[in-house]
Amino acid sequence: MAEPTYLNPFVLPVALVTPERHDPIDLYPPAGDGPYPAIIFVHGGPIPPEMQPSPRHWPMFRGYGSLAASRGVLGAVVDHPLHTPADYPAAGAALAEAFETVRADPRVDPDRIAVWYFSGGSPLAADLLHRPPSWLRCLALTYPLLEPFPGTEVDPHYRPVEAVASAGALPIVLTRAGREHPFIAGTVANFLTAAASVSANVRIIDVPNGRHSFDILDDTDESRTAIDTAMTEVINKIT
């Protein structure tokens, strides 16, 4: 039987780092003592708890974490309990705890942090957009869902399209897939309109031929360039 697509290889070749396991967080530290800036990667969802392996073990997140480490930044991948649309508050609370765990690591500069959200995990970015903490130097979004699907019951707090009004000067790096699901693409357009209305600091990286999950579905130079560009943009904000 074919493996599920979420176990596809990461399309950008990178020497894999063996992560340190600190359940529910995997750390990808560069060599040496630091202190290093850190990027915290937040997977999408909702994901049923029986789906195994959990996201921090997926090739794409091993790739992102290893890529961060190769650039001299500590990568952290967090499993969070977003199992149904009703779970955004619980997942947000788990992430808040994870943020402090990563910041407390002696190898991490606690004031140079980026948080990078993917897909259906992106509504969780509302927690940071509503009130950006001083330690947050960059917020990244890759093929993000930024409003709830019709018919889903989601806590109204978790609406980045509204929360971006409070983002201030926070740098936001948004990677947009050109062949995105139409509804998701509409939420991205609404977010960008809302961001423009308050002059939010958004850098857009377009992947014109990319699908949702282009980083594991579209093995192309375009995909690789988009990943590399996004990583460079984020690192430039925290170093």
PLM regions: where:
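Short beta-strand element of the alpha/beta-hydrolase
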Residues: P35-I47
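Short amphipathic alpha-helix adjacent to the substrate-entry channel of hydrolases
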Residues: P53-A76
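Alpha/beta-hydrolase active-site loop
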Residues: Y64, P85-P106
